[in-house]
Amino acid sequence: MRKNNTAIIFGGLFFSCSVMAANGTLAPTVVPMVNGGQASIAISNTSPNLFTVPGDRIIAVNSLDGALTNNEQTASGGVVVATVNKKPFTFILETERGLNLSIQAVPREGAGRTIQLVSDLRGTGEEAGAWETSTPYESLLVTISQAVRGGKLPAGWYQVPVTKETLQAPAGLSSVADSVWTGNHLKMVRFVVENKTLSALNIRESDFWQPGTRAVMFSQPASQLLAGARMDVYVIRDGEGN
């Protein structure tokens, strides 16, 4: 993965956009980031906050001005942080895969936050990289497809939240990213494709090919998609594709 140490991504204050879960608690807020980038995130200064990096583990927390009153790693690879500050401050998260994520914390009173920092993990992870580079290419694509669709991820692969993944669908079809799995050089995305017309449409795997695509697979053999029908389309992409 290409590192961008100068890029700064200000995700706004990821506070008001949080949705309320069924039990009345705040649902996790997903914040897309790049390695070396920065995001401005509202956190609670009256309750602990949980930060996680899906598919990775946070191994260090560095607060340059000592604004964090507590930070404690969790067994699952996240970190719980607390502060009583009322003014914005910055802290850095380091991960097992080598990511450095800068958080500009904006303290507010209220319930503790759960923040998922989603970064493109391609190019990181020695276990996945060793397996991908040692496996013949065609066999690699087949194995990834079978493993992910069978619910057993290859070594070093992880499921991560959907962020900006898109699929260019033919006329009459819509597509929505449903799930994402990532390794070292490759990632796999499942899209839900729907026929929005009033008649059946012919479809082929090649209809969904775009730059960075390495393989396209339908969830079941099909040459047509009926009016109003949906199907899953699995796409394997390299570092150049979203």
Curated annotation (Swiss-Prot):
A lipid is attached at residue 17 (S-diacylglycerol cysteine). This is TraK lipoprotein. Its main location: membrane. Residues 1-16 form the signal peptide. It is found in: Cell membrane. Involved in pilus assembly. The keyword Signal applies. GO terms for cellular component: plasma membrane. It comes from Escherichia coli. Keywords: Cell membrane, Conjugation, Lipoprotein, Membrane, Palmitate, Plasmid, Signal. It holds the Pfam family TraK_C. It comes from the Bacteria. A lipid is attached at residue 17 (N-palmitoyl cysteine). It is a lipid-anchor. InterPro entries: TraK_C, TraK_Ftype, TraK_N.
